[in-house]
Amino acid sequence: MTANPGTGGRNSDLASAVDTVTARYEAANPASRAQYERARKSLPGGNTRTGMFYTPFPLAIETAAGATVTDVDGHLYTDFVGDFSAGLYGHSHPAIREAVLATLDGGMAFGSTSPGEARLAALVCARFPSIEQVRFTTSGTEANVLALATARAVTGRDAIMVFEGGYHGGTIYFGRESAPINLPFPHLIAPYNDPEEAQRLIRENANRLAAVLVEPLQGASGGIPASAGFLEALREACSGHDVLLIFDEVMTSRLAPGGRQEQLGIVPDMTTLGKYIGGGFSCGAFGGPAEIMTVYDPSRPGAFVHHGTFNNNVFMLNAGAAGLEKVFTPPVQAALNAAGDSLRASLSELAARHGAPFQATGLGSLMNLHLQREPIHSIRDIAPKDPRLRQLLHLDLIDRGFFTTRRGYITLSLAIAESDCAGLIEAVDEFLTHHGHLLDSAPPE
């Protein structure tokens, strides 16, 4: 395909390319389309997890093994979604499977504490020095809700500070503004990676701020790392004004044994965890120093009540402990994130060689593909693009056998091999060869 000199020509070529890849996708996936239509009758939009939707209809995955998923039409894909970082161990890792089967044989839903509860808690506390004590929840969302509620209760203040582009769960989500179904906590929204503005807002609102909640890398908004200087500025301002600093390490805890906080040497007052911590089962956790967490000790007068039927789900506890003890050891963790750094560097080299508006942001095994040249330090830096460009890239990669996300987010699992990464690099190379000239297409008016 020859590039046309004008924007109008590029947009015409883009329409043709998108129509072609979409038609091929539709023809190849009749069973996924049928599943989507059936699901729409009982589920709004055909799903119960908004991020799973994409046009013209999403693939319906039926089985998975190792680093691959298979859809209802029988197509096998290399999985670069990694369940948005929850699928760290790949699909049915032997050590996780063994723990799950042993748990199944031993019974479930005890209605009591179990040895697995203290076992997983001890493993978490050993990895995160800032977490002296921890409590479990059923999701990262719930962990963040409880951390914020704890901060508000122990400080006696009601407001929280979050950041543009922050995602802390389905009810604590901030793009450029607060989402309609967010919990009604009084809040301030500050620009991400702007240390001076963040310090100013903390200083001017210290009398009502209970906590500052921040992701060391914003996943949902595009794999955008926080600079060390930004996080250090938050630590300094929070310490100076008795505001609790909460690190949402639901995703970034995979970057080092003690998470991103260990890598940077910045100690938060509280930390939230989730995703892979439960070994692939629904899980969340929040923790911090004993002086804060002791408010949940039910043997103490006036203790805070934290119920939850599945907080100590034995499958989550035992699978999570097996994963941390037997699989995700520090050397394995380092190798996984080195592989991610290598993949991201290779993708950047491709962009430079093709002269294409394309880049991969992120840290370690967490990354996001962007269709622009300009550096990205916050959601404000993400240029408006014709959404058909993302559709073109996404469906093209699916057509080549790579299961990815529409927004370009990629997380590596331990099952991903060097050859899988090489295959993805080759697929992106071919995409840029055939369609790179379209990536400068003007956004729709």
Annotate each language-model stretch with its function.
Residues L14-T63:
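Active-site-adjacent loop/helix segments that line or gate small-molecule/cofactor pockets in enzymes
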Residues I266-Y296, N312-L317:
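Active-site PLP attachment segment
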Residues R119-A211, Q218, D341-R344:
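PLP-dependent aspartate aminotransferase-fold enzymes
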Residues D341-R344, H354-L392:
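Conserved PLP-binding catalytic core of the aspartate aminotransferase-like
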Residues G323-S348, R380-P387:
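Structural signature of PLP-dependent enzymes
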Residues E215-A228, D242-L264, M270:
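Conserved PLP phosphate-binding loop immediately N-terminal to the Schiff-base lysine helix
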Residues L76-V154:
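Glycine-rich loop-to-alpha-helix module at the N-terminal edge of alpha/beta enzyme cores
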Residues T2-T7, V327-P330, A338, D396-E445:
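PLP-dependent enzyme catalytic core of the Aspartate aminotransferase-like
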